[in-house]
Swiss-Prot record:
This is UDP-N-acetylmuramoylalanine--D-glutamate ligase. Keywords: ATP-binding, Cell cycle, Cell division, Cell shape, Cell wall biogenesis/degradation, Cytoplasm, Ligase, Nucleotide-binding, Peptidoglycan synthesis. The gene is murD. It is found in: Cytoplasm. SUPFAM superfamilies: MurCD N-terminal domain, MurD-like peptide ligases, catalytic domain, MurD-like peptide ligases, peptide-binding domain. GO terms for molecular function: ATP binding; UDP-N-acetylmuramoylalanine-D-glutamate ligase activity. One of its GO terms (biological process) is peptidoglycan biosynthetic process. Pathway: Cell wall biogenesis; peptidoglycan biosynthesis. Signal peptide: none annotated.
Amino acid sequence: MERWQNIQNVVVVGLGITGLSVVKHLVKYQPQTHVRVIDTRELPPGKESLPESVELHSGSWNSQWLAEADLVVANPGIALATSEIQDVIQAGTPVVGDIELFGWAVNKPAVAITGSNGKSTVTDLTGVLAKAAGLNVGVGGNIGIPALDLLELDADLYVLELSSFQLETTSSLNLAAAAFLNLSEDHMDRYQGMADYRDAKLRIFNNAQYAIVNREDKETYPDHSMPLVTFGLDDQEFGVATIDGTEWLTDNGKPVLPSQDLTLVGRHNVANALVSLALLKQVGIDYNKSLEALKAYNGLTHRCQVVANKREIKWVNDSKATNVASTLAALSGLEYQGTLYLLVGGVGKGADFSELKPVLAQLDRVQLCCFGEDAAQFMPLHPSAKTFDTMRDIIESISAQLVSGDMVMLSPACASFDQFNNFMARGDAFTELAHEYA
């Protein structure tokens, strides 16, 4: 391939799952290159899996290797503002990421999704629906399997979740369609402000044939002119409309599926479903073949996932909600007939939880159950708020009063590491409690 003609020395910065996928890809498909790895950690994860031909410098930077490189492939966790990377850029050496290498190598259609919240669900759902339509699909990127490993599948379609970090080093990924779901404050430790963060996200549209954007969030629109497909919770393009008293997901006014047929919980997931339908349409897939799969889809583990539904009491695991924006999204348009028992708390990371107060005030019959290190910070948000030490304490306290129509939802708006190793362990603990008490 022409772009590799003058590339002999490649330095991969940062190992781990992504770095290892880059190394394996280079060794297999660009055997003429000399591959070296720099990782500032003493014992980088994946070290034991490195091919023997690949040199590793660990525990610090290696400025000589960087100076000798014709190409540097940086892990998305490493900010381009890092002084060592800035030196490489100033010297005129290209700095790319694994997604850029994927873009150089892929020869089948690809779609990608970015956004502050919901991108993992849309990525997974789009893959599920494309598979239901009969395609061999590779799903990954920022979620699950690294993009370069997906190339081994020789899929008909690739569906990628892309983070702002990955997009910073991506400039020539040709996408059949790209979706930008929403924009809310995140990663402000990495970016100079919201404009900087948005600019990174907008790179997803650079070589895309179609931009799928949120009518309710103009920040998701590209800054340059290109074909647009919009989604939202009104009756335009991909949207919703009430027909004979029933709300339907619609495609330019054409009814597709009643929203009540979705297993997914929450209004944000209605929007997520619309994005997946739009992505399928733009790559020429008949989404009507996938509607049964859409109805049955119950979400990614730990993301507004219905983990039990007995005696008409729904238990919803949204442990992935580690920030306020995620919990706000989960609460938006939440439908339940009885009382909502909302479990919040953990490590607040200095967040301002006051945004939750007006949303909680609008909900019918809510019991705010606060636990963990920063439980007290949630107490002023609702008159029903009570504090507990642990999740189990909450469930033991409320289980006897649960009745048909109630919903028990873990959407903590906090990190988990006061009581759990990670948000997955927290979600698993909630799921076990749900099965025990449902």
